[in-house]
Amino acid sequence: MPKRTDIKSILIIGAGPIVIGQACEFDYSGTQACKALKEEGYRIILVNSNPATIMTDPDLADATYIEPITPEVVAKIIAKERPDAILPTMGGQTALNTALSLRRMGVLERYNVEMIGAKAEAIDKAEDRALFREAMKKIGLDTPGSMFANATEIKDEDRKRHEVKRAEVKAQFSGDELDKALDKLETEWQLGEVERKQRYMSHALAKAAQALDVVGLPAIIRPSFTLGGTGGGIAYNRQEFFEIIERGLDASPTTEVLIEESVLGWKEYEMEVVRDHADNCIIICSIENLDPMGVHTGDSITVAPALTLTDKEYQIMRNASIAVLREIGVETGGSNVQFAINPANGRMIVIEMNPRVSRSSALASKATGFPIAKVAAKLAVGYTLDELDNDITGGATPASFEPSIDYVVTKIPRFAFEKFPGSSPILTTAMKSVGEVMAIGRTFQESLQKALRGLETGLTGFDEIAIPNIEEGDEKNAIRAAIGTPTPDRLRMVAQAMRLGLSVEQVHDASKIDPWFLEQIESIVKTEERIREHGLPQDAENLRMLKAMGFSDARLASLTAKDAEDVAKLRADLDVHPVYKRIDTCAAEFASPTAYMYSTYETPFVGQPRSEAEVSDRKKVVILGGGPNRIGQGIEFDYCCCHAAFALGDADYEAIMVNCNPETVSTDYDTSDRLYFEPLTAEDVLEILRVEKQKGTLHGVIVQFGGQTPLKLANALEKAGIPILGTSPDAIDLAEDRDRFQKLLIKLDLNQPKNGIAYSVEQARLVAADLGFPLVVRPSYVLGGRAMQIIHDERGLQAYLLDTVPELVPEDIKAKYPNDKTGQINTLLGKNPLLFDTYLTEAIEVDVDCLCDGKDSLVAGIMEHIEEAGIHSGDSACLLPVHTLSPEIVAELERQTAALATALHVGGLMNVQFAIKDGEIFILEVNPRASRTVPFVAKTVGTPIAKVAARIMAGESLEAAFDAYGGKPQPTARPHIAVKEAVFPFARFPGVDTLLGPEMRSTGEVMGLDYDYALAFAKAQLGAGVELPREGTVFVSVRDEDKERVLGPVRKLASIGFKVMATGGTQKFLEANGVESTKINKVIEGRPHVEDAIRNRQIHLVFNTTDSASAVSDSKSIRRATLMQKLPYYTTMAGAESAAEAIAALKAGSLEVRPLQDYFRS
């Protein structure tokens, strides 16, 4: 049937900040949904707190709310906008849980809002593990043996009592009085949440103890309604069991966990299914996890299509997944069903299903070309699959055709354990990866090796790796332990085990990885041995065969002790180049006008390999993307790449995107004119450029927008004679090179902190002695502050040089100096020296984003950090416009920024980080490229500055580029205030200290927007998941130099009814200054102490600053306890002051919600 006409406006809920388990894929799905529904004529209302998303661009929805995604805030948006329908299936778990809460609160009923895409009953049935198990039983599908630990009975009683009260209120009041009375009732219900949760936890823990006797150990624990397995895990003993149960019950919004029999080692599969309301069902893609059960699917290496299923098994699984959707009641849209198969006897069980688009949906969309989110959005408003065209084939096929693929797709996750010292790198059912790479090849081997080099962790393929503990004697057991333990490096361990003589059968016994995959890896390992022995083949046929197995030039070079350039020259001499094939959803059955391509060195049985690149004769620009997400390089850079593609299209260039991240909008088939899904290595990029140069004009390549990834390729591109648009590689190098940059600053008469540079361990000690402590030290050429630390004393320096720096040494240098740690470090520092700066205590840090065309420049935004200098800018909360800086300082910052931009001949964007101490300005860092603050600035000032920058890079003047997008912004003319807050994954890494420093650890960000600073800060906190208390007790323990300053926020909180609790010295100071407070013991002073009070929920807010290393160590347990109890915790005075202002503002009146568009209406 055609689309529904009874619906006029639709509210789409986004996913909020990037967190582990919920990343860019929901910007991709949300953006597709917005575009698809807007083109059908619906009024689109969007809520998302993440400014770095394409979906929050003001031209994508009719009303864009950058507001916290909480039920209370979304209820206000519904009251204001009165949408006809709400679509909750595009924003991950966040959107689903919010929609269900709105239904439970009666908001959807009160405002007559229909839930489309998935009914509440279907969401409940899929997400509530007890209901799901019953549903599977009903249709004859097996699930793991399991029991539940929950508090369903007492929850139902509480809910019934609440519903009786609601009915009484409805009978007693009407009109506005009814709305006020219902709001009051809901507020009372919300305030009782903590007490109810504690009762539910106690009840559920008792049930868990009973379940343990039945299920036994090991047991798999899965909380209900959580994201990426949050709170879950595998318990091997009783202590672990109760620790995970408690964590899981706390993480589950419904206080429920499922305790399952162990299915560790079984094979895991996923089916991506789409269904319409006429019951047409299609399988978009089957996905197989290379890692066996026991590892979260988001942390598993996966392949598509499934490669080790027989056709009979596939058909059984296909039918089962469709039956699951029908029974759960998913009437329209995409869903993901996960299965496990016991390889010993073939028993198939259903693990779970997601009644929404998911991470796997994004992977399946990119793997097949089928736009699941777009189709799901259109199905939600009434269309059937056969009424929709397949865009990829240009409408030659309808959307009801199941995709067919004639290639292999491999996804490998990317991890960041090095950012969280003390965290365990063992993978479990709780997701820990921060990003992923996808690669496409004609064979599994080609696809796998492309994915390994696309990870950007320094791998060129199956690089050698040391097996842990192998030198301790029992070699076989060490190898078995290494391949039997799921870690990020397990696949390389498998290859290393084979090099050390283990057979496929032995590796399978230890790892439970399917023998077919192991045989493929063994074939690669044996081929490597032959290359080592015989060298590179000198004929085209045999060299092409190696390339068809996925070997990179760099890997072949390392196997034969040559340079990668030598291998590339040999290939060029023998005319061995890849061809490019199209992803067309139909295995080449129909011609595809969509230029969505991958490279392959296929060797057909007959004739020559055929290229489907079909290069155009247009003027073209190539944009290099950011590769897999990682901490320090995420969605903000993808946002810039997308805006570059849009702007170049506006300027009539052909925009060509190169990227390998399946989660992103940049790898959507309609973001750019042409898309190459390829690893971002010099070899892969130069091959694409070789093909694109064959026709038309290559105007140049943009390396400025994708973070550090494309910048690393700039020199190789320049050497190959490729024009690089915007700022020159030499200027980028000048800003990174300490000596050259220092000379520039001297020439411009600009300050920087006293600093030094060290090319060896000995020199590092001399530089430190010369500068004195405290110091900031970091390796050169890094993004996200990798291995950047504040060093307070000689002991800290020693630990940094002997413990931290060795972790940065690449495998090839380790192999060169196997038993010489100092030799390894000095070799590394010879190329990448350590940079030392005097640490400026009590300084205000400032970020400035500016645009320049080489002559003229414009400062787009000056952001004042709430945290002091010394905390990585990506982890700091910041605000725009500045809050405490004088107009004179602001003018001087603008002058210095303009001087730097002109001196560096910046073409496009530049970011400068300043520190201001006692009125004096110091330059900390200059980045002549896009920074992670670009989207935040663009949304705040109302100008798409990344689009403007792309036009400048293509050759337009600053004036002309701004004129194309409505003229230059007038930041000072806007009365609103924006606050950016970082979001951290600490809850995923038990045991890790949450104290921030110069190494970046946040995964995402949110934005708070208001006309009042305190409310903007409050919104940013709420958006980041920090629930600011309106009443209760504040705990205060601060270092001596902060005691005067803490009086202000503490007095403010005391004046609005907060009680104050403090440790000895702070408590005496507060009392002496007229602030009534209660003394409590520090942890080292004996019990009952502050940590007990936090765990007993007697404390609701924490202000804690530390000075010495011992004080930092002493307060670590307090930081962990506040994290686990989800308490707001502030470790800087600026943060404490802002929090106190925000709490007072919230208590004084309610938050108002406004669409982004309203802030820019004159």
UniProtKB/Swiss-Prot annotation:
* Biological function: Large subunit of the glutamine-dependent carbamoyl phosphate synthetase (CPSase). CPSase catalyzes the formation of carbamoyl phosphate from the ammonia moiety of glutamine, carbonate, and phosphate donated by ATP, constituting the first step of 2 biosynthetic pathways, one leading to arginine and/or urea and the other to pyrimidine nucleotides.
Provide the protein name: Carbamoyl phosphate synthase large chain
Q: Which residues bind ATP 1?
A: 129, 222, 228-229, 261, 263, 268, 294-296, 338, 352
Residues reported to bind Mn(2+) 3: 913, 925
The record's region (Allosteric domain) falls at 1026-1162
Q: Mind telling me which SMART domains this protein's record contains?
A: CPSase_L_D3 (SM01096), MGS (SM00851)
Q: Where is this region: Oligomerization domain?
A: 457-613
Q: Where is this region: Carbamoyl phosphate synthetic domain?
A: 614-1025
